Amino acid sequence: MEKETKSLAWPATAEFYGWVFIFSSIQLCTVVFLTVRFNGFKVGREYAVFTFAGMSFNCFLLPIKMGLLSGHWTLPRDFCAILLYIDDFSAYFSSWSLVFMAIERINYFCYSTPLLNENSKALAKVCFPIVWVVSGVQALQMLNNYKATALQNETGQCFLAFLRSGHDMWLMLVYSVVIPVMLVFFYLYSKNFMLLKDELSSVTTYLCIYLLLGTIAHLPKAALSEIESDKIFYGLRDIFMALPVLKVYYISAMAYCMACDDHTVPVRLCSIWLVNLCKKCFSCTRREKGSDLEVGIKMLK
């Protein structure tokens, strides 16, 4: 009865992944366009590109997850392990790329000198090998936990790639949210005397938003993974299980905000464009109504 109850909840989760895939694809393309279009040449654009690349891995894994959860595809355990490793690696890689990009932006605010480009290039050469190694090691630890759990399970399905234990989810919360944010906060505290008040509040706001959204994305799954309940609760638990996928949204949006010289410029331009579009649509509607009224008057005459 327990397996049947769980299987009833998988289509809802697959549909949720489908909507996330559609909107995240549009959002990633939009943010990449805005970053390329409005970003300055002296800012760490490569940091944003690497962050988008990591989140694109997670985004394009969603159709595979949809096929597995809906029962249309079946994969052996070895391929499930590869899928799980790539999924975790993309999340860790994006988080740590965002950390180094935040450090680069803090340096950009602190040191307005001609040596800025050299410092940024040196930081980029050092940080990206570190990001690859740290992300790979952290994802490998999750993979070992998955293999140990798979040996105790008799089914050949790939559901274990999604039914993570609470211990694994706590590790992901600590590795991808808590530790990166604490490192950036510590670096920000060491450089706070070199920052203006507006710059300090801006960076601190981004970090607090990232910490809040990251906790919201991981905490429900970590807290509810080991809880057993009835059929209705299984559906809610599986929706909570999909919340980490929403990192596609807020990591890329924060990467865009931190990589741009003035991130308010494209926001203002987009808002002006939307306002003008609404005005045009409203004016066209009024014209159509007016023309219909004129036609009716002519017909009466």
Curated annotation (Swiss-Prot):
CDD domains: 7tm_classA_rhodopsin-like (cd00637). Keywords: G-protein coupled receptor, Glycoprotein, Host cell membrane, Host membrane, Membrane, Receptor, Transducer, Transmembrane, Transmembrane helix. Coiled coil: none annotated. It is a multi-pass membrane protein. Residues 37-48, 104-122, 190-199, 260-301 are cytoplasmic. It comes from the Viruses. Its main location: host cell. It is found in: Host cell membrane. GO terms for molecular function: G protein-coupled receptor activity. Glycans are attached at residue 153. InterPro entries: GPCR_Rhodpsn, GPCR_Rhodpsn_7TM. Residues 1-15, 70-82, 144-168, 221-238 are extracellular. GO terms for cellular component: host cell plasma membrane; membrane. It holds the Pfam family 7tm_1. The chain crosses the membrane at residues 16-36, 49-69, 83-103, 123-143, 169-189, 200-220, 239-259. Signal peptide: none annotated. Belongs to the G-protein coupled receptor 1 family. This is G-protein coupled receptor homolog U51.
